[in-house]
Amino acid sequence: MRKTFLAGNWKMHYTSTEASIVAKKIATEVKTLKDDFVIMITPPFTALSKVSECIKGSNILLGAQNMSYMESGARTSEISPSMLLEFGVEYVILGHSECRLYLGETDEIINKKILTGLKHPFKYLILCVGETLNERDSEKTLDVVLNQVKKGLDGVSESDIKRIILAYEPIWAIGTGKTATKEEAEEVHKAIRLEIMKLYSKSVSDNVIIQYGGSVNSSNVKELMNEPDIDGALIGGASLKAESFLSIINNVL
């Protein structure tokens, strides 16, 4: 049975002090978890240190929103794997649509980040994939998404794929209030799982975690999680307040 992964992506919100207050509220409330349930939060880089202290010893994992594919060097504004590990980061989001759009990250760059991350002891790397509204309207969703999956996982071995979480985030649903219907989301998740089977094996595809991201909230999370190929959620705005994030968690538990 696959685990359920709920990850809160705080993007460029909160100072370190603000983030630590929210993190502490979440960690305090989430006292017990089933073995098949994982909760993660990803504050801004500047808040990693304080948040790490706030959730130490709790059931909450600490994540980062991005990472360089270089170990060190002349990369102004970037952050290396070892820098993240120093703060206790256990997973990293890679290939988020906002990084693809605003930072010009290509499938090739994202693949380099995946391969670099696998050389370090992160528990999980989350590979984000998704299509634009124009691509969906042109019936190119599966072509676009599966191509991103293949390019993102290029060179990833079968032994390493167990540390990869895939996150389907339709770009047209991120921060817009629009959400893919459970049927639309399940169709893409099922296609991703079948693609993983082609690339690796049925055993791998049966066990790979695939999250959904795109205006997830307490009202729609339950029906999304009830779909057979949706194993969790990558949550943006609804994870920024402890109350709304906890409501999502309680609706899934």
From Swiss-Prot:
Enzyme class, spelled out: isomerase
Claim: Endoplasmic reticulum is one of the keywords in the record: no
Mitochondrion as UniProt keyword: no
GO molecular-function terms, A-Z: triose-phosphate isomerase activity
Catalytic activity: D-glyceraldehyde 3-phosphate = dihydroxyacetone phosphate
Pathway annotation from the record: Carbohydrate biosynthesis; gluconeogenesis; Carbohydrate degradation; glycolysis; D-glyceraldehyde 3-phosphate from glycerone phosphate: step 1/1
Record-listed E.C. numbers: 5.3.1.1
Active site, renumbered: 96 (electrophile), 169 (proton acceptor)
GO BP: any one term: glyceraldehyde-3-phosphate biosynthetic process
Superkingdom in the source lineage: Bacteria
CDD domains: TIM
One GO CC term on file: cytosol
Family recorded in the similarity comment: Belongs to the triosephosphate isomerase family.
Name of the protein this chain belongs to: Triosephosphate isomerase
Organism: Borrelia garinii subsp. bavariensis (strain ATCC BAA-2496 / DSM 23469 / PBi)
